[in-house]
Amino acid sequence: MKESEIKIKISLDENKVPEQIHWTAEDAGERDQKSEAVLISLWDAEQQNSLRIDLWTKEMKVDQMKTFFHQTLMAMSDTFERATGDEKMADDMRRFCQYFAE
């Protein structure tokens, strides 16, 4: 079985607040890419629970965060539809995203 790694490096200030976020995915040809935020969700099937890592740098502006969330929610709507086939719910989610963007 082939394995692949995605590495995320977080630089923290003295108060453990993220100052820099860099990621590498060598299989995709990406090395030391800078990012201002990362949201990771993992599913624990045994516990039937989501595990999350939500980080953003202190330099990220509120308007950037709103755009980031809007784009993330839109992508989640598409992923939800592909994963479940539930077009109606995905459309409801997209309508919320339109409202969110206003």
Residue ranges and their predicted role:
Residues M1-D32:
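Short, charged/polar N-terminal "headpieces" of proteins
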Residues I8-I10, I21, V38-L42, M76, ...:
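Generic structural hydrophobic/aromatic packing signal, biased to beta-strands
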Residues I21-W23, D32-V38, K66-F68:
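Surface-exposed beta-strand edges and their flanking turn/coil or helix-capping segments
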Residues D27-K58:
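Acidic, aromatic-enriched beta-alpha/helix-loop junctions
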Residues E30, M60, Q64-T67, Q71, ...:
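Alpha-helix boundary/N-cap detector
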Residues E46-R82:
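Cysteine/selenocysteine-centered motifs that mediate thiol-based redox chemistry or coordinate metal-sulfur cofactors
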Residues D78-E102:
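C-terminal charged interaction modules
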